[in-house]
């Protein structure tokens, strides 16, 4: 898969692609990373890519001439690539979008914004706008790197096991369960016994419980209506005994943890009062 960036600061892209998983993926020929600098399409001594906005206002706006010329050059190299402009006004990146990109079979051209953003006419040469969240960064290079990293994890051979990507948080629709490694005991904190049992059925059950509990506590918006009902509502009458027992145990654990947290908050209030 090929990733071509249109950044004002290509060294940020080159630096990110020269380390860790991305570097190994590139060395194996699984991904190709390159840049086209819009400054190379300017015609003044200062290589100017921005100008003041019509109508007034703070900041500078990226000029259409060098940006569009760079996009044209990128499309010459990757004629079938999807052109994505990184900007706050785009649709927000989610794991489902990452997987859509990864399985599309397409290459990607990332156009990186800066300053107050793009001249609106630049978007005529863009397939879609993409944001990584509801906050503003200095430039679009880091968001574009994040998207490349997320996509690359789904390319066969990039990770040790493709399951590593498929089992990550958000790929399953749930937050990830806690992970542990050696030593068994660290400063009085022990690895849960179930993870050392070798019983994979029990381990999988424990992991699912932890994922559901974490998601309910931290990101309930990720749960489906059915999952929320199983965790907090009435259990269906027709249900396998093993499944019913699983959710009854899980609900009891959730209730106990909520009671424990409430008790700790009361003690803290009393101490501060």
Give residue ranges: language-model regions:
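Structured adenosyl-cofactor binding patch, chiefly the S-adenosyl-L-methionine
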Residues: 118, 122-168
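S-adenosyl-L-methionine/SAH cofactor-binding core of RNA-modifying enzymes
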Residues: 63-112, 119, 156
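Short glycine-enriched loops at secondary-structure junctions
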Residues: 38-41, 114-118
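Hydrophobic/aromatic beta-strand patches that form the interior of the parallel beta-sheet core
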Residues: 4-6, 34-36, 82-84, 108-109, ...
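Short, solvent-exposed amphipathic alpha-helical segments in soluble enzyme
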Residues: 20-24, 99-103, 127
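Internal, active-site/partner-interface "lid" segment
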Residues: 142, 154-194
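SAM-dependent methyltransferases
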Residues: 183-273
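N-terminal nucleotide/polyanion-binding subdomain common to many enzyme families
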Residues: 1-74, 201-217, 221-224
């Amino acid at each position: 898969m090929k990733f071509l960036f249109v950044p004002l600061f290509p060294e940020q892209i080159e630096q990110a692609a020269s380390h860790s998983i991305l570097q190994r993926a590139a060395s194996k020929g699984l991904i190709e990373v390159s840049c086209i600098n819009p400054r190379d399409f300017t015609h003044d001594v200062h290589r100017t890519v921005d100008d003041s906005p019509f109508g007034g206002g703070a900041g500078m706006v990226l000029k259409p001439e060098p940006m569009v010329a760079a996009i044209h050059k990128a499309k010459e190299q990757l004629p079938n690539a999807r052109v994505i402009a990184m900007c706050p006004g785009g649709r927000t990146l989610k794991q489902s979008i990452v997987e859509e990109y990864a399985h599309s079979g397409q290459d990607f051209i990332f156009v990186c914004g800066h300053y107050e953003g793009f001249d609106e006419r630049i978007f005529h040469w863009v397939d879609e706008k993409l944001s990584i969240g509801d906050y503003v960064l200095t430039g679009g290079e880091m968001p574009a790197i994040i998207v490349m990293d997320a996509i690359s994890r789904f390319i066969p051979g990039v990770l040790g096991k493709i399951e590593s990507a498929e089992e990550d948080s958000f790929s399953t629709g749930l937050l990830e369960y806690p992970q542990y490694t050696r030593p068994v005991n660290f400063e009085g904190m022990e690895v849960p016994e179930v993870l050392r049992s070798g019983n994979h059925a029990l381990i999988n059950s424990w992991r699912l419980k932890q994922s559901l509990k974490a998601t309910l506590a931290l990101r309930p918006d990720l749960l489906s209506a059915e999952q929320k009902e199983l965790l907090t509502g009435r259990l269906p009458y027709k249900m396998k005994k093993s499944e019913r027992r699983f959710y009854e145990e899980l609900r009891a654990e959730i209730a106990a943890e909520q009671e424990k947290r409430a008790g700790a908050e009361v003690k803290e209030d009393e101490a501060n009062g």
